[in-house]
A protein has these predicted regions:
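Positively charged n-region of N-terminal signal peptides that target proteins for export
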Residues: 1-4
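Acidic, polar-rich low-complexity tracts and alpha-helical solenoid repeat scaffolds
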Residues: 20-121
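Bacterial N-terminal signal peptides
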Residues: 7-16
Length: 121
C-alpha cells in the first residue's frame, strides 16, 4: 500500500512542483545583474532609452549587448529580451560604421537564432 501511495500521489505531485518552479523562472528578476558590467534588466532598458535620446557609443552598446546575451543564456524564455535586442540592432546600425553594421548584423542573427517566432526582426 505504501508503494502505491508513493507511486500515484507523491511522484505526480513532485512533477507539478518542478513544473511550477520552472514557470516562475521564465522572467529574470529585476534585481539580477548580467554581463561584465552587472546590468539589471531595468538598467539595460534605461540605457537603451538613453542611447536613443542622447546618442550611442560603440563601447557602451557593446557592454549592453554582452549583458543581453548573458540574460538570454540564463532566462531564454524571458519575453523582454527580443524587443531589447531589436532596439540594440537599430542602435548599432545608427552608428553608421563598419563595426556598428557588423554588430547590428550579429544582433539580427541572434534574434533569428534565439527568437525565431518573435515579431521583432
Amino acid at each position: 500500500m505504501k508503494q502505491f501511495v508513493t507511486l500515484f500521489f507523491v511522484v505526480p505531485l513532485t512533477f507539478v512542483c518542478v513544473t511550477n518552479a520552472q514557470a516562475h523562472t521564465r522572467l529574470a528578476p529585476a534585481d539580477e545583474n548580467f554581463g561584465r558590467f552587472g546590468m539589471s534588466p531595468l538598467e539595460i532598458t534605461n540605457r537603451i532609452h538613453d542611447a536613443q535620446v542622447r546618442g550611442a557609443s560603440y563601447r557602451g552598446l557593446m557592454g549592453m549587448q554582452g549583458a543581453i546575451e548573458d540574460w538570454a543564456a540564463k532566462y531564454p524564455l524571458d519575453p523582454w529580451i527580443a524587443p531589447r535586442e531589436y532596439l540594440m540592432s537599430r542602435l548599432f546600425a545608427g552608428l553608421r560604421s563598419h563595426d556598428g553594421n557588423a554588430e547590428a548584423a550579429h544582433c539580427r542573427a541572434f534574434l533569428r537564432t534565439h527568437y525565431p517566432r518573435t515579431r521583432y526582426k
